[in-house]
Each structure stands twice: as structure tokens, then as C-alpha cells.
């Protein structure tokens, strides 16, 4: 099941990301229409289907960087194959709406931080956006927020040796939310049930 839009918005509000939050969208995301609101969370499915997989994005105008954080670290081709979703189209739309010279540097996640059967993608996306809000020039690594999770190469994310790392990532993320989101704490049992490490069978 994963996270709902309402849950993500409430958690992001607790994390003080709301001032930067463009919104939550399905795969029809129109692009970055406001430089003052550079952080959307986008689902790979149409909203009427109930959603599939959350991806966080962030636009940093000072250096025309477009950050795309997929907790699985899938390539554009893999996202197209699995979810019929392409971020290159989003990148083109974003360049048209947000950059004077229409030149955007794509910086995407290539490692996996989420377990293969986990439904925690929305929460990991929220963690990334909090990292961006506090460290917009360096949201992917090298700061105390995002460094609580450790990536493994995408091609090895189903290996037995990777699973303890990915499980620890999810536990660290939960602990972060326990310390920083009253909404998460008050709904912890239900959120953990819906985003469990072994939710997808």
C-alpha cells in the first residue's frame, strides 16, 4: 500500500519542508512551475489507480540542478519497463518552465536505499526532501540527514548480502521520523504496517 498523499504532506509539514513543497503529484506532473516551490513528490502511476511508487524531486536554480531521488535507484529505462514512467520527459518540461537557457543538469540516484519488498518509498522521498531543504547544494550525501541511509548498487539490491543494509536503512528512517514528526508518532503503527520492509510479497 505505501504512503498516502495526506500522510506525506503531514510528515513533510512536521519536517518543515512545506514552504518548499510544490505538491504531491501522479505521473502527470506538469514540471517545476515555481522556483519558490522546488520540491515535488511524484508517483509513477495515475492517481486514480491508487499509486505505485513515489519518487522525490528537487530543483536547485543556482546551478540549474534537477535532483531525482528514486529509493530504488532505477534507470529511466528500468522505470519505463516496470512502471511505464519516464523522468526524461519531466526533465524536458522542467527545463522549459524553470530555466532561462533551458539547460538542466540531471543528478539522479543510482544506488538503492529501499528493500526490494519494502513499501517505504514515500517516506524515503520525504527524508530526501528534508535533506534538500537543509542542504540544497548537497542533498544526496555528506550531510547528517541523508547519511543515515546507505546505498547499495541497484544491480545488487536483491542480493542476500544487501538486505541487512537496506533493512537498517528503513529502521534508521523510522527512527528519524519518530524524533522529528509528531504525525508519524501518532500514526506509527498504521504507517509502519503499510510501509513495511516485507510488505510486497
Curated annotation (Swiss-Prot):
Record's subunit section: Interacts with protease cofactor pVI-C; this interaction is necessary for protease activation.
UniProt induction comment: Expressed in the late phase of the viral replicative cycle.
Active site: 53, 70, 121
GO molecular function per UniProt: cysteine-type endopeptidase activity; DNA binding
Major localization listed first in the record, in broad terms: virion
A Gene Ontology term for the protein's cellular component: host cell nucleus
Entry keyword Transmembrane: no
Record entry for activity regulation: Requires DNA and protease cofactor for maximal activation. Inside nascent virions, becomes partially activated by binding to the viral DNA, allowing it to cleave the cofactor that binds to the protease and fully activates it. Actin, like the viral protease cofactor, seems to act as a cofactor in the cleavage of cytokeratin 18 and of actin itself.
One biological process term in Gene Ontology: proteolysis
Protein family according to the UniProt entry: Belongs to the peptidase C5 family.
Pfam families with a match to the protein in the record: Peptidase_C5
Function: Cleaves viral precursor proteins (pTP, pIIIa, pVI, pVII, pVIII, and pX) inside newly assembled particles giving rise to mature virions. Protease complexed to its cofactor slides along the viral DNA to specifically locate and cleave the viral precursors. Mature virions have a weakened organization compared to the unmature virions, thereby facilitating subsequent uncoating. Without maturation, the particle lacks infectivity and is unable to uncoat. Late in adenovirus infection, in the cytoplasm, may participate in the cytoskeleton destruction. Cleaves host cell cytoskeletal keratins K7 and K18.
Note: All late proteins expressed from the major late promoter are produced by alternative splicing and alternative polyadenylation of the same gene giving rise to non-overlapping ORFs. A leader sequence is present in the N-terminus of all these mRNAs and is recognized by the viral shutoff protein to provide expression although conventional translation via ribosome scanning from the cap has been shut off in the host cell.
Localization: Virion; Host nucleus
Organism, as annotated: Equine adenovirus B serotype 2
UniProt entry tagged with the keyword Coiled coil: no
Catalytic activity: Cleaves proteins of the adenovirus and its host cell at two consensus sites: -Yaa-Xaa-Gly-Gly-|-Xaa- and -Yaa-Xaa-Gly-Xaa-|-Gly- (in which Yaa is Met, Ile or Leu, and Xaa is any amino acid)
Origin: domain of life: Viruses
Protein name, UniProt field: Protease
Keywords, comma-separated and alphabetical: Autocatalytic cleavage, Disulfide bond, DNA-binding, Host nucleus, Hydrolase, Late protein, Protease, Thiol protease, Virion
EC number: 3.4.22.39
Residues flagged as site, Cleavage: 50-51
